[in-house]
Amino acid sequence: MTESTSRRPAYARLLDRAVRILAVRDHSEQELRRKLAAPIMGKNGPEEIDATVEDYERVIAWCHEHGYLDDSRFVARFIASRSRKGYGPARIRQELNQKGISREATEKAMRECDIDWCALARDQATRKYGEPLPTVFSEKVKIQRFLLYRGYLMEDIQDIWRNFAD
């Protein structure tokens, strides 16, 4: 940390840090609070910012006011991103919970997203096990276990074979 930055008020340093963090990607409010509270890595090792709780609250409020921090936008983008990577609704809900997003906000966003989880589960299964999907019980169990690990619901997994039989 240079001498000029160490003279800046803690609020200004926190605000600068928050904007830099949020410029990279969206974060939940809890993630941003955790990152702001972490020590800054300087040339001489970790350096603490002598900021008060009020400074942190002002920075968070400023980020909300100016549109840098929006949990609903974060949730929508997170769901879209993780579903594109092949994860199911149960896994996405768990990850959002770990990121400090309320259950209500998560459920609202999951209802609003337009994702066909059954089709996504089928795509993941065919990507991993090939087309056509096996009909032997032991192979079905492997696919089921894989999809459950990826976060798909049992009803979506069972629909794969129901739709396959049609």
Swiss-Prot record:
Membrane keyword on record: no
Coiled coil: none
Subcellular location as annotated: Cytoplasm
GO biological process, one term: regulation of DNA repair
Superkingdom assignment: Bacteria
This protein's UniProt keywords: Cytoplasm
Primary site of residence: cytoplasm
GO cellular component: cytoplasm
Family: Belongs to the RecX family.
Known function: Modulates RecA activity.
Record's protein name: Regulatory protein RecX
